[in-house]
Curated annotation (Swiss-Prot):
GO biological process: DNA-templated transcription termination; regulation of DNA-templated transcription
Gene: mtrB
InterPro entries associated with the record: MtrB, Trp_RNA-bd_attenuator-like_dom, Trp_RNA-bd_attenuator_dom
SUBUNIT field: Oligomer of 11 identical subunits arranged in doughnut-like structure.
Keyword terms of this UniProt record: RNA-binding, Transcription, Transcription regulation
GO terms of molecular function: RNA binding
UniProt record similarity statement: Belongs to the MtrB family.
Physiological role: Required for transcription attenuation control in the Trp operon. This trans-acting factor seems to recognize a 10 bases nucleotide sequence in the Trp leader transcript causing transcription termination. Binds the leader RNA only in presence of L-tryptophan.
HAMAP family reported in the protein's UniProt record: Trp_attenuator
UniProt superkingdom: Bacteria
Source species of the chain: Geobacillus sp. (strain WCH70)
Protein's UniProt name: Transcription attenuation protein MtrB
Pfam family, one: TrpBP
Stretches assigned to coiled coil: none
Length: 74
């Protein structure tokens, strides 16, 4: 694992925020998921296995490219 891989910070702004890691390769698959409650923070890293991270729910997301807030369910 390369410790210089990008990290992202995800802070849940509501209960039940799902964070899902997606795999690399010919077939994209879910390989890990976490459920966060309001105020909980997850620090995630892109690795040789993780090519994408999906956030479902209202959360604050910080990366080296900037900051964004995802929208909750309406």
């Amino acid at each position: 694992m390369n410790i210089n891989s990008d990290y992202i910070v995800i802070k849940a702004l509501e209960d039940g925020v799902n964070v899902i890691g997606l795999t690399r390769g010919a077939d994209t698959r879910f390989h890990h998921s976490e459920k966060l409650d309001k105020g909980e923070v997850l620090i995630a890293q892109f690795t040789e296995h993780t090519s994408a991270i999906k956030v479902r729910g209202k959360a604050y997301i910080q990366t080296r490219h900037g900051e964004i807030e995802s929208e909750g369910k309406k």
